[in-house]
């Protein structure tokens, strides 16, 4: 299988990239800059991961997404929501946090852009880094979303590009363990909503990664 991989530089996308390489050829890694606070760190992490695996990497800029949303991910006046570890498995708390960082149709936009590259490069798959934990609060991480996206792509691409997510049925701990087994370079990953010198260790993305690493026996700096 030939793939275009959506690579944000985070845990899920890094492990999904490694999975893609085991299952076939990765033609291109795509990273999106939509004005998010972590954009520079994500681009740096994604570029480092692509270089590690000796793959082509391209950044696509989508400034309009920042213009049309007030999400805390991009807003200069809104603080990123902090979380507590004990809240990570509480559906109501997770949904409230998700609403604060929601970007309109973000994954839909990403997948359709990647599908255009996939069709042009005669690739079979667009690979995304979804996971079971966040599917409950982010509907565009869910298996139903992938099914719907594939139904749409079967009409909008002549070669019937499909979306695949090798991590979608796994929780974060399982994803870390899978990455450890495949030798994923965790030191290159950026799993934070913020763009400071170091990960904040307070946002939901950080806390999920830290908890998973601890449970899986992965030491973080």
From Swiss-Prot:
Catalytic function, reaction form: 7-carboxy-7-deazaguanine + NH4(+) + ATP = 7-cyano-7-deazaguanine + ADP + phosphate + H2O + H(+)
Positions of Zn(2+) binding: 192, 200, 203, 206
Domain of life: Bacteria
Keywords, comma-separated and alphabetical: ATP-binding, Ligase, Metal-binding, Nucleotide-binding, Queuosine biosynthesis, Zinc
Pfam families per record: QueC (PF06508)
MF terms in GO: ATP binding; ligase activity, forming carbon-nitrogen bonds; zinc ion binding
InterPro entries documented for this protein: QueC (IPR018317), Rossmann-like_a/b/a_fold (IPR014729)
GO biological process entries: queuosine biosynthetic process
Residues noted as binding ATP in the record, renumbered to the chain: 7-17
Associated pathway: Purine metabolism; 7-cyano-7-deazaguanine biosynthesis
The family this protein is said to belong to: Belongs to the QueC family.
Assembly notes: Homodimer.
Function, as annotated: Catalyzes the ATP-dependent conversion of 7-carboxy-7-deazaguanine (CDG) to 7-cyano-7-deazaguanine (preQ(0)).
PANTHER family: 7-CYANO-7-DEAZAGUANINE SYNTHASE
Protein name stated in the entry: 7-cyano-7-deazaguanine synthase
Native organism: Pelotomaculum thermopropionicum (strain DSM 13744 / JCM 10971 / SI)
Lineage: Bacteria, Bacillati, Bacillota, Clostridia, Eubacteriales
């Amino acid at each position: 299988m030939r793939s275009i991989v959506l690579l944000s530089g985070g845990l899920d996308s890094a492990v999904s990239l490694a999975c893609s390489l085991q299952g076939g050829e990765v033609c291109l890694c795509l990273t999106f800059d939509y004005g998010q606070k972590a954009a520079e760190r994500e681009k740096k992490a994604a570029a480092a991961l692509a270089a590690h695996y000796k793959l082509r990497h391209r950044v696509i800029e989508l400034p309009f997404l920042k213009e049309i949303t007030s999400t805390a991910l991009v807003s200069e006046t809104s603080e990123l929501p902090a979380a507590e570890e004990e809240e990570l498995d509480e559906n109501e708390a997770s949904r409230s946090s998700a609403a604060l960082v929601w970007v309109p149709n973000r994954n839909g936009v990403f997948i359709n852009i990647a599908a255009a590259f996939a069709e042009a490069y005669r690739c079979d798959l667009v690979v995304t880094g979804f996971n079971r934990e966040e599917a409950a609060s982010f509907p565009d991480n869910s298996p139903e979303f992938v099914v719907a996206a594939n139904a749409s792509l079967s009409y909008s691409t002549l070669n019937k590009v499909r979306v695949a997510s090798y991590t979608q049925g796994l929780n974060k701990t399982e994803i870390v363990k899978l990455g450890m087994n495949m030798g994923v370079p965790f030191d290159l990953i950026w799993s934070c909503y913020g763009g400071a010198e170091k990960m904040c260790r307070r946002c939901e993305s950080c806390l999920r990664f830290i908890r998973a690493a601890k449970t899986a026996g992965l030491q973080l700096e």
